[in-house]
């Protein structure tokens, strides 16, 4: 495999010249999907309505005082028709959303909730009626609390059977109208963030180091995710694929990576980071086993695939879902004092420290489009050029700061340019989804930060939506009225200047 470091020179060379080149929607393949994304807990609200049971995020967010939770969020459960109309007006070609396991199957297994089933059928029908392709994620961090309480969730192999049964219901009930299925969202980050720092969700307060074996649970959870994903994939291929003709995939959180210096130590550290952050999930999907460097580093802490499991995992993804926001320089300095407290044990295993390329605060981070281009080229060359969907990419800003979110429009423009470059250079990238369609309850920033192209007034009981400049830019790009090489973003800002305040 080519390490990430070998792409850095290529990416920097093209980034200086290519992102200002003209491109339009017509420069992408006809079947390429441009869309936007949300997730169930962050968008739906209605946390205890119509038979829904608590998820681990309901439990965890209720540890906070006041209304700092997703109980109502954007109220998408009641306002989905309004939101689909906004998508249609924008010209979205696809909408990515997740299905709440605890809304559809409240006990985690067994009885289907008819009102939950009807909601998702109606949402999919509404999307289809407006010519919008549903892209469905089965798991977006919101395990039914009942399964967490019963056996500990993803660290127990019982999750494989329960997740496969949940997927079976979804394929059976929605599969005629859904052709793109992502099994698990951000599998890498979910395992690291939920288990690697010992703060497992579904507890109030969340589990800490004294009650969780953080040295092993990250890798156990990741292993069980791969087995659950491959089990559900095998089910789909045997039972549904011939008739429904859909595709199934797994999503990873993909950091852009580059050596901090040209030293051998930093290049080697970057190779280790690539193995842990990409190869951990992607290599089993290609060859049926973990990267050698992970096996050498972790020893008995890394679970082992049986021969049968290896065969099942290999080839179990029709596509790779990429979630990308940040790019980092990698340096070989694993001293604990240099590693942030969150995820520190995982990065100690890597033996590396990640330094943000540009500003990377809670409310803002810089556009580093060469990072995404490098990711797409790396996956192409290291993992047999699989089909890729960029399932999330977007820019945070302080919520309620302005409707004229020019930095967000410029961010989206730059990253679409990076995708265009990667496709030109042979990447089989097939879709790009902005995070997010509207302002959401953010799992980290709560209501302080937002990514939406539509502003949501969370103080308004009606959750009024208002378009931002980025929504107008994306609309113009999709319908061909925005010339990316011109000053149209600036002109658009002037045109919208009369509605900049909230």
Curated annotation (Swiss-Prot):
EC number(s) recorded for this UniProt protein: 3.2.1.21
Position of the signal peptide: 1-22
Glycan attachment positions: 208, 359, 425, 457, 479
Catalytic activity: Hydrolysis of terminal, non-reducing beta-D-glucosyl residues with release of beta-D-glucose
Gene3D superfamilies: Glycosidases
Keywords, alphabetical: Glycoprotein, Glycosidase, Hydrolase, Signal
Broad EC category: hydrolase
GO molecular function: beta-glucosidase activity
Active site per UniProt: 186, 392
InterPro entries the UniProt entry points to: Glyco_hydro_1, Glyco_hydro_1_N_CS, Glycoside_hydrolase_SF
Binding residues annotated for a beta-D-glucoside, in chain numbering: 42, 140, 185-186, 325, 392, 435, 451
GO biological process, one term: carbohydrate metabolic process
Pfam families cross-referenced by the UniProt entry: Glyco_hydro_1 (PF00232)
SUPFAM superfamilies tied to this protein: (Trans)glycosidases
The keyword Ubl conjugation is annotated on this UniProt entry: no
UniProt similarity note: Belongs to the glycosyl hydrolase 1 family.
PANTHER family reported for this sequence: BETA-GLUCOSIDASE 10-RELATED (PTHR10353:SF211), GLYCOSYL HYDROLASE (PTHR10353)
Protein name per its UniProtKB record: Beta-glucosidase 7
């Amino acid at each position: 495999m080519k390490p990430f470091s070998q792409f850095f020179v290529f990416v920097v060379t093209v980034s200086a010249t290519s992102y200002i080149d003209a491109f339009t929607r017509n420069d992408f393949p006809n079947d390429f999907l441009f869309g936007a994304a949300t997730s169930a807990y962050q968008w739906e609200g209605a946390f205890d309505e119509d038979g829904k049971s608590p998820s681990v995020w309901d439990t965890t967010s209720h540890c906070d005082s006041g209304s700092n939770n997703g109980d109502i969020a954007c109220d998408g459960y009641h306002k989905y028709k309004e939101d689909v109309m906004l998508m249609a007006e924008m010209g979205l070609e696809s909408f990515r959303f997740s299905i709440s396991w605890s809304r559809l199957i409240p006990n985690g297994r067994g009885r289907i909730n008819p009102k939950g089933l009807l909601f998702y059928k109606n949402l999919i029908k509404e999307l289809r009626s407006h010519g919008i392709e549903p892209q469905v994620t089965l798991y977006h961090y919101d395990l039914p609390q009942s399964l967490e309480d019963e056996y500990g969730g993803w660290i127990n192999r019982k999750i494989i059977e329960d997740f496969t049964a949940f997927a079976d219901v979804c394929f059976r009930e929605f599969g005629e109208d859904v052709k793109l299925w992502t099994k698990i969202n951000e599998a890498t980050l979910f395992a690291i963030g939920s288990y690697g720092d010992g703060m497992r969700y579904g507890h109030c307060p969340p589990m800490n180091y004294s009650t969780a074996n953080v040295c092993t649970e990250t890798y156990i959870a990741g292993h069980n995710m791969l087995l659950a994903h491959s089990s559900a994939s095998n089910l789909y291929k045997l039972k549904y694929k011939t008739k429904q003709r859909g595709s199934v995939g797994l999503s990873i959180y993909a950091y852009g990576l580059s050596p901090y210096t040209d030293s051998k130590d930093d290049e080697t550290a970057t190779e280790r980071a690539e193995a842990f952050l990409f190869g951990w999930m992607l290599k089993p999907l290609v060859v049926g086993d973990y990267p050698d460097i992970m096996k050498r580093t972790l020893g008995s802490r890394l679970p082992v695939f049986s021969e049968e499991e290896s065969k099942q995992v290999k080839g179990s993804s029709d596509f790779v879902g990429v979630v990308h926001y940040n790019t980092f320089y990698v340096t070989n300095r694993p001293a604990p004092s240099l590693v942030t407290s969150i995820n520190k044990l995982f990065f100690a295993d890597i033996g590396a420290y990640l330094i943000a390329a540009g500003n990377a605060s809670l409310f803002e981070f810089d556009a580093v489009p060469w990072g995404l281009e490098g990711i797409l080229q790396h996956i192409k060359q290291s993992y047999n050029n699989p089909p890729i969907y960029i399932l999330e990419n977007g820019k945070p800003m302080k919520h309620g700061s302005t409707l004229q979110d020019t930095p967000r429009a410029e961010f989206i423009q730059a990253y679409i340019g990076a995708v265009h470059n990667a496709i030109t250079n042979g990447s089989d990238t097939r879709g790009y989804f902005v995070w997010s369609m509207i302002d959401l309850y953010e799992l980290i920033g709560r209501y302080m930060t937002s990514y939406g192209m539509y502003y949501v007034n969370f103080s308004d009981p009606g959750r009024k939506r208002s378009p931002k400049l980025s929504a107008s830019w994306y609309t113009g790009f999709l319908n061909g009225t925005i010339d990316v090489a011109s000053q149209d973003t600036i002109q658009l800002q002037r045109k919208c200047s009369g509605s900049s305040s909230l």
